[in-house]
Design a protein with these regions (language model features):
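C-terminal non-catalytic regions of proteins with extracellular/luminal or membrane-system context
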Residues: 1-249
Length: 249
């Protein structure tokens, strides 16, 4: 941030770093951006001009070696964003507004720059199929459990990890939040050309919502789940070039 300490006033890079970015862009030379930061920054210009962006967070004393191994292809990156990268602060609620409207991937109405759960790798892993083992029904109790079986294949030439994610929304519950929410996930390692079936457990509690009295319960009767490598929205589909598979309860 502009003061190099404390809370940020905005999502911009410090002024000297903004100047560095613009100077590099002017050279016309292809470049990769490594972002070492503990929170979201404005990456809108880099999204257009940088050939790739590696979000390194705060990697520690040996982070430089790990970053170099990723950049030179010795390590295949497979991380997923645990936050949302917004396009800008424009349209965001005021800091003094404590409602959840437009905050986090669960309540956002506008499109993000990079969505929660998104991340690329050097691999090429596809989701072939996904289905609920046994009968798919809306749970009657929080203790009910479902197993989703997902079949994935590595079409690439090197070993790779992928994170299979399950998002869910109760479609006939007025208490439900606007967007599907992450309820389960599993990281999977595949060798080149390997095909693997993954079991992901979803509990009945994932179908619960909280009403206006603050009571959590099973208030709906129909739900839709989405299995894939990211959120079930158009932005993630464009960025990954892959579709999710919908399941119905």
């Amino acid at each position: 941030n502009q003061y190099y300490s404390g809370d940020k006033d905005d999502l911009s890079f410090p002024k000297p770093q903004q100047l560095l970015i613009k100077t590099i862009i002017k050279t016309g030379v292809p470049f990769v951006t490594v972002v070492t930061a503990g929170s979201a920054l404005d990456l809108s210009l880099l999204d257009i001009k940088s050939n790739a962006i590696l979000q390194a967070w705060y990697p520690g004393a040996r982070g430089g070696k790990t970053i170099a191994e990723i950049l030179f292809g010795k390590v295949n990156p497979s991380g997923k964003l645990p936050i949302t990268i917004y396009k800008s602060l424009e349209g965001m609620p005021e800091f003094t507004d404590y409602s959840m409207k437009d905050r986090t991937y669960r309540f956002m109405e506008n499109e993000a720059l990079y969505p929660f759960g998104f991340g690329l790798s050097y691999g090429d892993i596809d989701l072939i199929e996904a289905a609920v083992e046994g009968e798919a029904f809306f749970p009657k109790d929080e203790s009910d459990k479902f197993t989703i079986k997902a079949k994935i294949v590595n079409r690439g030439t090197q070993a790779s990890d992928e994170v299979v994610q399950v998002y869910l929304k109760v479609v006939d519950d007025a208490n439900e939040i606007p967007n599907p929410r992450l309820v389960a996930f599993k990281r999977v390692h595949l060798e080149a050309s390997e095909e693997k079936e993954v079991d992901i457990e979803v509990s009945g509690k994932a179908f619960t919502t909280v009403n206006d009295d603050g009571v959590r319960g099973l208030f709906g009767s129909k739900a839709e789940a989405h299995v894939g490598f990211g959120q079930p929205n158009e932005l993630t589909k464009r960025l990954l070039g892959k579709n999710n598979i919908a399941l119905f309860f």
